[in-house]
Amino acid sequence: MARRLPVYLLLDTSGSMSGEPIEAVQNGLATLRSALNNEPQALETVHLSIITFNDRAQQDTPLTELSQFQIPQLRASGCTALGAALKLVAERAEVEVAKNTPEAKGDWKPMVFLMTDGEPTDDISEGLAAFKKRKWGVVVACAAGMSANESVLKSITESVVRLDTASSDEFKALFQWISQSVVSSSRSAGAGQELTSGDMLEPPPPEVTIL
C-alpha cells in the first residue's frame, strides 16, 4: 500500500465563530480541497480529516483520500473544548495512521492544523499529554483574532500564527497557505524525501502573522 500523508484539521466551531468567521472557514475548506485536487501528487498521497470542537470534540470526517473527501457542513455553537479535540486527534491518529513494520514503511507523520478564536473552556492537560505522546510531522496552531489564548497554543506547538482580525480575507489567506504547505509536503513525499517539520511549511502570506 502506498504511503499516505495524513492531514488533520482541528477547527473551533464554538458560538463565537458564528456568522462571517464560520462561513469563511467553510469557504476555506473548499479552497483547500480545490487546490489539492489540482495537484497530482497530493491526489496520490494526501488524506484529510476534519475534527471540530465546541461543547465537545467530534471527528466530522475520518481520514479520507482526496477523491472521496466531502466537506462537512460547519455550525457554530457552544463552548471551546480544545482539550477534548487534542485527545480525539491523538486517538484517531493512533487508529488511522499506518505505522512502520519490518516489511514496509508506514504513513508519513501527520500534519496538524489547529484553529481557534478563543480560550479553552475545558482542562487541556489530559488532551495535551495524549497529543504530545504522538509523533507528528508538523503542528501549526492558528490564533484567529485577538481573543485566542496564544500561550495555550504555544504549549501545544512552537509553530503558532495569528490572524489579527479573523476577517474573511485573512481566513482565505490562511487556507491558501495551508494548501500550499500540504502540496509542497506531498511533492517532497512523492520524491521519497523524509519529511521534517522545518521543510513542510511554505512562508506565510502577510495576512498570517508568525508569533
Where are these regions (language model features)?
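Cofactor-binding loop segments of dinucleotide-utilizing enzymes, especially the Rossmann-like FAD-
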Residues: 53-55, 117, 142-146
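P/S/T/G-enriched low-complexity
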Residues: 4-5, 130-137, 143-211
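Extracytoplasmic/secreted cell-surface and envelope-processing proteins
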Residues: 18-19, 120-125, 151, 170-172
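Extended, charged alpha-helical interaction scaffolds
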Residues: 108-120, 125-128
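Short, flexible, mixed-charge acidic loops at enzyme active sites
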Residues: 60-68
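Von Willebrand factor
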Residues: 2-61, 68-108, 111-115, 138-152, 166-173, 177
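Catalytic-core regions built around general acid/base machinery
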Residues: 32-35, 127-135
